[in-house]
A protein has these predicted regions:
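Generic structural detector for well-ordered beta-strands
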Residues: 40, 97, 142-144
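Short cysteine/histidine-rich metal-coordination sites, predominantly Zn2+-binding motifs
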Residues: 183-190
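The feature marks the first
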Residues: 1-59
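Mixed-charge, glycine-accented linear interaction segment located at domain edges/termini
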Residues: 114-181
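Short, well-structured hydrophobic secondary-structure segments
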Residues: 37-80, 86-88
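Short, structured motif recognition centered on aromatic/hydrophobic residues
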Residues: 24-30, 49, 53, 105-109, ...
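Intrinsic, low-complexity N-terminal interaction/targeting segments
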Residues: 1-26, 67-133, 137-140
Length: 190
C-alpha cells in the first residue's frame, strides 16, 4: 500500500525524544491545522538530517543570493513534541528538496520496509541522493517548511541529540547509568 502524507506548508515542525539516555526513542513531527503527523526515527538519522538541512540551506543561500537570510530563532518550548505520540511509520530514507517558486524546503520521509532496507555491505541512501516521487512500498510523508523553520529544526535536533549519555574521558564511549567497561582501564567497570 502506497500512502503519501503531504503537509504543504507545515504550521510547525519539530523533533524530540522520550526515554532514558541510551534507551531513547526519537520522533520527527509536523502539524498543519488539525493534522498531526509523527514519525519514528533513529538518532543517527536525526543527526544526519540536522547536518543535511544546514548544508542544504547554506548551498541555497550561495546559489540564490537574492534570498533573504534565514536565521535560527526559536524557544525550546516551541519545539516540544505534541501528544499523542502515535507514529505513522518508522522512517527509512530521508531526503530534502527545494521549491524555488514558493521558497519552501521539503523534507521527504519514506517508510522503512523490508524491501527498502540496504543489503548487507550496501550503503543506505544519503540525504543528497534523488528521492523517488512515490514510495516503492509503504508510506511516505512530505513536510514543506520555510528555510527558517528547517534551520530551527536542525538546531533543535542538535540540542536533543547532545542531551544523551555522558562520554567516558578515557575511551569516549557512552556511559550508562550503571557505568561501563572501559578498554582504556583494562575493561574495569567505572
Amino acid at each position: 500500500m502506497n500512502e503519501l502524507n503531504d503537509l504543504n506548508p507545515v504550521d510547525r515542525i519539530c523533533a524530540g525524544c522520550q526515554g532514558e539516555p541510551g534507551q531513547r526513542v526519537f520522533y520527527l513531527q509536523a502539524r498543519k491545522g488539525g493534522q498531526l503527523i509523527t514519525l519514528l526515527c533513529e538518532k543517527f538519522q536525526m543527526q544526519q538530517l540536522a547536518a543535511g538541512i544546514t548544508k542544504f540551506v547554506d548551498e541555497l543561500q550561495a546559489r540564490f543570493d537574492e534570498l533573504p537570510a534565514a536565521v535560527t530563532n526559536f524557544e525550546d518550548a516551541e519545539m516540544e513534541l505534541e501528544e499523542p505520540l502515535e507514529p505513522r511509520f518508522r522512517a527509512g530514507q530521508l531526503g530534502l528538496g527545494y521549491d524555488e517558486a514558493e521558497d519552501l524546503l521539503v523534507l521527504v520521509a519514506q517508510e522503512l520496509t523490508e524491501n527498502a532496507q540496504a543489503a548487507p555491505g550496501e550503503e543506505p541512501p544519503q540525504l543528497d541522493q534523488p528521492i523517488e516521487q512515490e514510495p516503492p512500498d509503504g508510506q511516505a510523508a512530505r513536510f514543506w517548511a520555510t528555510r527558517q523553520q528547517m534551520l530551527n529544526l536542525a538546531a533543535h535536533i542538535s540540542l536533543v541529540a547532545s542531551r544523551g549519555r555522558p562520554r567516558c574521558g578515557n575511551c569516549m564511549q557512552p556511559i550508562d547509568p550503571t557505568g561501563h567497561f572501559c578498554p582504556q582501564r583494562n575493561g574495569f567497570k567505572h
